[in-house]
């Protein structure tokens, strides 16, 4: 199935999604990679507020390249999500609802997705220029010293994504190969 979603999202918005579904995501998406996640954990440990509201948020694991003249953003392909696994459950427990990246997630992340009615969506790896076409606006909102890993607020329209982990425990990286082998 194909779904159109607009952030921020609720448990009810995400409940119909199943692993393998296509999502066209619009609204605000925040960028945060390894170093930004570490800074968010440090801020939370100190009782500080984060640079954006986690409730219903979408976080894209991306470090975009510099934009060319006349462009909103440079290439914006996903980075490997596993590097955020140690920190993702905490953010999910605090209200983050959508994680966007590529690659498998660990069991703690999978459990946190189900526990919080969240989803993990995959962006097409190797297609950073395609992903960038969905971005309408971009603004650095925190930690500019991190360069490409600074936290950005993106406004996106119809960003093409695939549901990898759904709120019901579905995992496309398990069900996809199994369905293929069964069909042979």
Report each predicted region and the residues it spans.
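Short, structured beta-strand/loop micro-motifs enriched in basic residues and often containing a Trp
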Residues: 1-9
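Feature captures the catalytic cores and cofactor-binding loops of soluble hydro-lyases/lyases
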Residues: 31-32, 36-159
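Active-site/ligand-binding-proximal alpha/beta "capping" segment
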Residues: 88, 164-184
């Amino acid at each position: 199935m194909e779904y159109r979603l607009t952030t921020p999202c609720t448990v009810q918005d995400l409940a119909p999604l199943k692993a393998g579904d296509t999502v066209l995501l619009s609204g605000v998406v925040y960028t945060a990679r390894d170093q930004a996640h570490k800074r968010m954990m440090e801020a939370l440990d100190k009782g500080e507020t984060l640079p954006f509201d986690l409730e219903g948020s979408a976080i894209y694991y991306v470090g975009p390249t510099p934009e060319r003249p006349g462009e909103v953003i440079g290439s914006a392909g996903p980075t490997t999500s596993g590097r955020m696994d140690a920190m993702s459950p905490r953010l999910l427990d605090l209200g983050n609802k959508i994680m966007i990246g590529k690659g498998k997630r660990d069991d703690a992340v999978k459990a946190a997705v189900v526990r919080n009615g969240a989803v993990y969506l995959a962006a097409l790896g190797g297609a950073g220029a395609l992903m960038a076409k969905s971005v309408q606006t971009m603004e650095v909102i925190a930690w500019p010293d991190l360069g490409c890993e600074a936290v950005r607020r993106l406004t996106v329209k119809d960003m093409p994504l695939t549901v990898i982990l759904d709120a019901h425990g579905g995992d496309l990286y398990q069900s996809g190969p199994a369905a293929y082998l069964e069909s042979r």
